[in-house]
Amino acid sequence: MDSKYFPEACFVDSVVSAVLGMGIRRVIGNIIVETGDSPSRIPGSWPWEDVANYYGALYHSFNYRDNTYTLNMRSGKAGTPARLLSVVPSVPGVKFRNEVLSSVKNSNDAWIYGGPEAATLLIQGTIPANRSLFAVKGAMHRPEDCFLVEVEKRLKKAGVMVDKQEVEKGNNGRQLLLTMISPLLKDIVFYTNKNSVNLFAEALGYLISPTDYAKIVKEELNHIGIDSCGIILKDACGLSPANAVPAETFTDLLLWARESLGDAFLASLPQGGVDRGVRVYSDHPVLRGNVVAKTGSMFGVRALSGYLKNKKGETLAFTILVNNYEGDPVKVQEIMRDFLREIAEK
């Protein structure tokens, strides 16, 4: 709900408009988000330093604003403490301990630490010096709580009061307020690949199977003739370092996808010379516009899988996986780029 990737949905606005449209000016009782009895569980193999940051946002039964909040910060001279100005949207029940410093480095090296039950989250690291406003993004561990605060605030602003009284729960007298239509699956896949939205990947994994994702994926691969040996899947988004997929599996899947999925899948892949994610990998005239590929990265790991058009006009599927390297990650990316260039020029 209210994903930045689908701004036309405007869920909170629609709720407020529907309430006003029914002539409601007072809610006797409370607003309840029914999330079920099974809370989302963080995969045990996810790095602890990732779970409170935006790319560690879990898929929940109710999801709001990409399950992401923004810490708006202000920095001063290098070496001085940065100020936390605001948290948008509000994260009820959570306090932030800010230990972020201003730095000469022009990069976001601030991190949020803390689990889903933590009452206090720690912000450490650095942000660029002398910024009047700098955003650090975190993962909502309880998106329904953030939604409730926001919708109650918006209703109050519109003149609708919520009494917050305890009322007897039940299905009697329920009346449909509004219906929201999901974006198309191909559009969700588009942003999953183009923007590396881990939350969307986890949601798609849940759609495949809430409990047996890895098993179903292997069965489907075998069904379409792709060997699933050597595959270890601990999540759907790739945040777990315990995942393992052979390069051959990715490449075989790309060959199948080109024949079976059509243009929608191809359009979802970042394009060389256009999309920022593959900028380094396509930084050569023979590669610009001729590489479409999905990137993957974590500490000591760089991955690239997609399609390359060579000088002969042939389209080749490829996968490059570099694990546990030492040194400059940009240098590793440049080596991968040069490898692609050599193939493209043959």
Task: Pin down the residues of each PLM region.
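Conserved serine DD-peptidase/penicillin-binding transpeptidase domain
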Residues: 1-228, 345-346
